A protein has these predicted regions:
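A short beta-loop-beta micro-motif enriched in histidine and acidic residues
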Residues: 44-47, 58-71
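A short, N-terminal "cap"/entry segment at the start of jelly-roll beta-barrel domains
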Residues: 4-9, 14-47, 96-97
Length: 129
């Protein structure tokens, strides 16, 4: 778990004074999911997996759950996430954490494919996808 916090600190905790000629833009700093619930971490040896995810125009993401936090950073397009009868819309530039253990589904509601960077914050031996 300490490694997870170190990785998250490196990704999100740096400020622009660290880079002499660079620029750092904070994408997300939160203790809650995009649905307003507290973030819950699994116990065990941390294993972070990052990948690019694409949803075609009109395409759904079938109902599913996660047993670990998932950070989603929308790079292109617009997606509607539905969970517990409520809908949340995220567009390019938005970042959010999905709830752990709660069924949700999504749909591309824009006119271009949705491209997102997805960071799964699981543990060793846990199935990610």
């Amino acid at each position: 778990m300490k490694k997870l916090f170190l990785i998250l600190f490196v990704l999100f905790g740096l400020n622009s004074s660290v880079f002499a000629d660079g620029h750092v833009k904070r994408i997300l700093s939160t203790s809650q999911t995009g649905m307003g619930n507290d973030i819950v971490y699994p116990s065990g040896k941390a294993k972070i997996t990052a990948f690019e995810f694409t949803v075609p125009v009109g395409g759904p993401v079938v109902p599913h759950t996660h047993s670990f936090p998932v950070l989603i950073m929308i790079q292109q397009g617009e997606i509607e996430l539905t969970q517990g009868g409520k809908s949340y819309v995220y567009k390019a530039g938005d970042a959010f954490i999905e709830d752990v253990g709660v069924a949700h589904e999504s749909k591309n509601i824009g006119d271009v494919p949705v491209k997102a960077i997805v960071v799964a914050m699981g543990v060793e031996g846990q199935k990610i996808m």
